[in-house]
Amino acid sequence: MLVIVTENVPPRLRGRLAVWLVEIRAGVYVGNPSKRLREFIWEQVEQGLEEGNAVMAWSTNTESGYDFQTLGRNRRLPVDYDGIRLVSFLPPQDVDGVL
């Protein structure tokens, strides 16, 4: 299972993601691609992101049962805590430089 959530991305990237995944809500895509296709899809996100941000989560053989990666500016920062991936939240001013 793969889930990608996007914010403030160009319409062409949203259309591109809809080629391989189902957009179940604005900016939320799900599917069950192979690892190779998942990596290709993420490359498309990296190339088309512009000023937006995205997160991709997928099922895998880890202790938590999933893994994820992020791209772009947002308040959520992935951290590794004893082999478990967690999310740390930054204060709003750390993202934009202002309150």
Could you tell me what each predicted segment is?
Residues 1-99:
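Basic nucleic-acid-binding interfaces
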